[in-house]
Swiss-Prot record:
<keyword id="KW-0539">Nucleus</keyword>
<dbReference type="GO" id="GO:2000024">
    <property type="term" value="P:regulation of leaf development"/>
</dbReference>
<dbReference type="GO" id="GO:0042803">
    <property type="term" value="F:protein homodimerization activity"/>
</dbReference>
<dbReference type="GO" id="GO:0009742">
    <property type="term" value="P:brassinosteroid mediated signaling pathway"/>
</dbReference>
<keyword id="KW-0963">Cytoplasm</keyword>
<dbReference type="GO" id="GO:0005737">
    <property type="term" value="C:cytoplasm"/>
</dbReference>
<dbReference type="GO" id="GO:1900457">
    <property type="term" value="P:regulation of brassinosteroid mediated signaling pathway"/>
</dbReference>
<dbReference type="GO" id="GO:0051512">
    <property type="term" value="P:positive regulation of unidimensional cell growth"/>
</dbReference>
<dbReference type="Pfam" id="PF23174">
    <property type="entry name" value="bHLH_ILI"/>
</dbReference>
<keyword id="KW-0341">Growth regulation</keyword>
<dbReference type="InterPro" id="IPR036638">
    <property type="entry name" value="HLH_DNA-bd_sf"/>
</dbReference>
<comment type="subunit">
    <text>Homodimer. Interacts with APG. Component of a nuclear cell elongation controlling complex made of ILI5/BUL1, LO9-177 and BC1. Binds directly to LO9-177, and interacts with BC1 only in the presence of LO9-177.</text>
</comment>
<dbReference type="GO" id="GO:0080113">
    <property type="term" value="P:regulation of seed growth"/>
</dbReference>
<dbReference type="GO" id="GO:0009646">
    <property type="term" value="P:response to absence of light"/>
</dbReference>
<comment type="function">
    <text>Atypical and probable non DNA-binding bHLH transcription factor that acts as a positive regulator of grain size. Involved in the brassinosteroid (BR) signaling pathway. Binds the transcription repressor APG and forms a heterodimer of antagonistic basic helix-loop-helix transcription factors that regulates grain length and weight by controlling cell elongation in lemma and palea. Contributes, together with LO9-177 and BC1, to the promotion of leaf inclination and grain size by modulating cell elongation.</text>
</comment>
<dbReference type="GO" id="GO:0009741">
    <property type="term" value="P:response to brassinosteroid"/>
</dbReference>
<dbReference type="GO" id="GO:0006355">
    <property type="term" value="P:regulation of DNA-templated transcription"/>
</dbReference>
Length: 88
């Protein structure tokens, strides 16, 4: 990637477009857009919102797991399965 950088060390427009395209491919339900500034801004906002939703989902799953573990016998086979999953 550094071979495509200009002598100033900045990122080329081509590299930015490639990175935007890669980012877009990581988002669920992402549609093809033009390379305009408005589309890039919208894509970055969607990315931030998606990351926030993933954080909320992780927090929710963590809470649910904590609740489940609190109600289980810590020596039960189910508790051991959960511990082994968390270790992996």
């Amino acid at each position: 990637m550094s071979s495509r950088r200009s002598s100033r060390g900045s990122i080329s427009e081509e590299e930015i477009n490639e990175l935007i395209s890669k980012l877009q491919s990581l988002l669920p339900n992402s549609r093809r857009r033009g390379s305009s500034q408005a589309s890039t801004t919208k894509l970055l906002k969607e990315t931030c919102n998606y990351i926030k939703s993933l954080h909320r989902e992780v927090d929710d799953l963590s809470d649910r797991l904590s609740d489940l573990m609190a109600t289980m016998d810590h020596n039960s086979p189910g508790a051991e399965i959960i511990r082994s999953i968390l270790r992996s």
